[in-house]
């Protein structure tokens, strides 16, 4: 078979020699069908073991190409390699299929390639076909939460539907090229999470998976040993959220017989630098060593960030979740594989661990471009302020933009040039205490820079007494200017304990030399400064903004530049005119501690939030509503939707309540901050009762969406919040249902099971058209599809699922769509049954009842909707008093 008939197969490897050799030995068995392309991130084993091993395979024509990166840049290495392949040799006319996989996997089934290609041929709407994982070595004993890595799939006959990690993923080449274009256009990298989002949300395609072939995960074997340094490393707690956009130079090795790229790499890619021979010497200097390596190219694209993490390959495991749904957020893993199983790994692990990066990489292996300037723009702060146009506030760092949102945007940069980010919407006073505590935590850390960026009018009500804690700690003399409704930022050097600059202008650029010795400030506009040296006669304290204000006299300032040179003493009040003419006056004598209302935080893993979004949004606005004239009784709410919730900085305060969706990480149980959990699993299942007992035993209040679950659990501390009538949501759904032409008789939405399949097949046998929305349909796509149907049916998944699903049904019942539901365990407690909004019947009568409903007139029971709406609203506010 010629090379053009073979399938290119990208294999990402890193550091673990035994695992790499097992994986490549497996792949080489199929070298007659695969053009194997190795993508290696540099490690301590590269020069002495891995590189010679791979070069030998190339010389024996067992490996097609070998991308060797100068350092560990995680999955970005696979991203760069695929981009290069698309530009140079990955022609879909010559190579209709392509594989991408992690290098720690093997497959026993010898027909795995044929099975995957057959699935792609049978399913034209398939985005990719991954390989099913073998869970026989799942490390449950050492990592009990690994049960959450098990993925559920929908059986489609010859194949499964459900997401995988980078587990022998087979693509149609045009599909992969289009996906890479999307990633590049949006500044994204080849990561599981981005691809999961792209295939479903952007392309509305399905992710398929093998049924017969199973992949064995070699890295899981490492976890079987609890004393293994890597296992210990895995089980640590990490407190940093990483934004990885690191890039690096690479060398491309390929055999003479198949090297067709010598003229394909652009000058911009090569940076006009001299060709580096395999022995590391420039071709301008003759080498005395024989050249026994294949031809290669050096693409020394400059890296904007140093290697800050030891991990790179995307893997198939799922994040530690107590429910069986995938965490699609990819996280990097120190065995060289970017692994959704591993979350938030730090870069400062001990050097005696197997994933440590070497410090002795050969300097002449990868050269800096000859024309690289000595100085390089590395950081730009954009603070748009109020009414300053449409440009987005945020931080440009290492050619990556990190957008801010309204309020205080707190960025920190570590010594390894990784970014952390936190936002506080300070349009009111309630967040200031939390904001101050957060900023103060970085003062004695190993972070290098602290950037505080203000966006829009977030600082109008800031309390100076609170901010003084930060002002005094960081010696920020002009902090009281944050009272101005305007743009503002400051950059603080945490190592040198000094302010680099603060400015009320729009832009700032920080420039430094290539070796990062120091920072020099460049500003595009004139800096606004104040030299507050006046001493308040009452306190004799310098550099405290509250020392400059009193109530005897006022000075109006309509422009920030008017503050320059202004001397303030103890006899004057500063009165700052905001741009909407709302005056802001403050004085030391008048400042009071703000009354912080209760702030509710909805906390959920981003990967599962779509299950809870409709329910949470039905009542979150009510948390923000003012039901009392007493400020102490008012509340606010915000959402923390992230796959990093296990490392979030939770505030231990009576004014902060964190409401978790479905699960709370075990290590948070003993934390003293206020916490609750929304539990939506069916308590007619014994295992779910065991799960909920964990929260009860730790005295964590449980919020139920189902009154039936409330009765089953029978715990006096439980809280019932029924699905609320959300006027905005119901208006959209009602318009959809009433105005969408009907293409189907019945809509079914949910995971498929034999019990459900029987009902659906029986409905079809009666000549009715059924729309099956099975897994992966969420949001507007789901709603627009359901609106094409006349009736929605609710069938329990199995015999032990006996609780009515209000999150699926109630919103459509409010929108006047007829609902037919199977009886549930305590359905006599349901208001939708009491007032006839939903039709209930036994399982065996569902088909008959659906036919009767379709034949009958669809009478809009608006009076019942109104009664239920107000009843639930009243119940919610009664519940809120006890939260």
Swiss-Prot record:
Residues 258-373 are annotated as: Disordered. It comes from the Viruses. Residues 259-268, 277-317, 324-333, 348-368 have a biased composition (Low complexity). Residues 334-347 have a biased composition (Polar residues). Belongs to the mimivirus L137 family. This is Uncharacterized protein L138.
